Amino acid sequence: MANHPSAKKMIKVIKKRTMVNRMRKSRAHNYVKKFLLALAAGNKELMVETFKKAESNLHKCVNKKIIHRNTAARKISRMALKLKTFDLQQQAKAL
């Protein structure tokens, strides 16, 4: 347990920061899940919209050092690949 007043204050500050970071990370994770649900439903407009929001939120998390940049890059890359393959499949069906 902290004995100095400054250490006690830092414990409170860290708890607040942790909660904010959890909310931001959760928001980014939820957009990724919404993208995957739109992919499963086959809704292209919703996929594009949620992809943009997910990408934006992941980049914000990287800038605030909530997640590592390589983790965000990997997730964005995988979502972009899924979006591209979905688009190619739709074009192949149209032909």
UniProtKB/Swiss-Prot annotation:
SUPFAM superfamilies, alphabetized: Ribosomal protein S20
InterPro entries associated with the record: Ribosomal_bS20, Ribosomal_bS20_sf
Keyword Ribosomal protein among UniProt keywords: yes
Stretches of the chain forming a coiled coil according to its record: none
Keywords of the record: Ribonucleoprotein, Ribosomal protein, RNA-binding, rRNA-binding
Gene Ontology MF terms: small ribosomal subunit rRNA binding; structural constituent of ribosome
Domain of life the protein comes from: Bacteria
GO biological process, one term: translation
Pfam families, alphabetized: Ribosomal_S20p
GO cellular component: small ribosomal subunit
NCBIfam families: S20 (TIGR00029)
Family, per entry: Belongs to the bacterial ribosomal protein bS20 family.
Function text: Binds directly to 16S ribosomal RNA.
Protein name: Small ribosomal subunit protein bS20
